[in-house]
Amino acid sequence: MHILTAGVDEAGRGPLVGSVFAAAVILPETFDLPGLTDSKKLSEKKRDALAEMIKEQAVAWHVAASTPEEIASLNILHATMLAMKRAVYGLAARPEKIFIDGNRIPEHLGIPAEAVVKGDSKIIEISAASVLAKTARDAEMYALAQRRPQYGFDKHKGYGTKQHLEALKQYGVLPEHRRDFAPVRNLLAQQALF
């Protein structure tokens, strides 16, 4: 009998703006999707195509997030763990085992879980979760870019690039920015002095 195994991964821990996303995916026993690997190794076009195929073929999948406010109140690590728990609890089927990318497991999952370092390159369920989390995170950045094109979110995806830091200085901090992240926090402190 096939054991329902979920893979879990996150996207968006490092950026200065937006939510941190996590996805949980349960795949069928015979699942095979050529080219599926760690989302960071895939082009955006390939990720988007794979995401659609994963959603169509998965036994269950769920994407969840923790907001910038939750990141500020919990810290990025705990907010990531919360997003992972939400992703697991949002699955339409209950997995019997969970593999989580990285070296930490959210507390009180209630399901046997194992952390796998570089799991997004080793375990297909984690690879699938990696793709879904990354495409959801990118979608949030594209939506923000539509509302605030001057920041260039569609290009740098919220990371602390030169373009993003210059836009922060020129246009200011948005409600979506992570106020507890050093570049944003430092800019707010400088502005408070003047």
From Swiss-Prot:
First-level EC class: hydrolase
UniProt KW rRNA-binding keyword: no
Single GO term (MF): manganese ion binding
Keyword flag Metal-binding: yes
Main location as per UniProt: cytoplasm
Keywords for this protein: Cytoplasm, Endonuclease, Hydrolase, Manganese, Metal-binding, Nuclease
Gene3D superfamilies assigned to the protein according to its UniProt record, in alphabetical order: Ribonuclease H-like superfamily/Ribonuclease H (3.30.420.10)
UniProt-listed Enzyme Commission number(s): 3.1.26.4
Binding-site residues for a divalent metal cation, renumbered to this chain: 9-10, 101
UniProt family annotation: Belongs to the RNase HII family.
Alphabetized PANTHER family for the sequence: RIBONUCLEASE H2 SUBUNIT A, RIBONUCLEASE HII
The protein, known as: Ribonuclease HII
Protein source organism: Neisseria gonorrhoeae (strain ATCC 700825 / FA 1090)
Origin organism lineage: Bacteria, Pseudomonadati, Pseudomonadota, Betaproteobacteria, Neisseriales
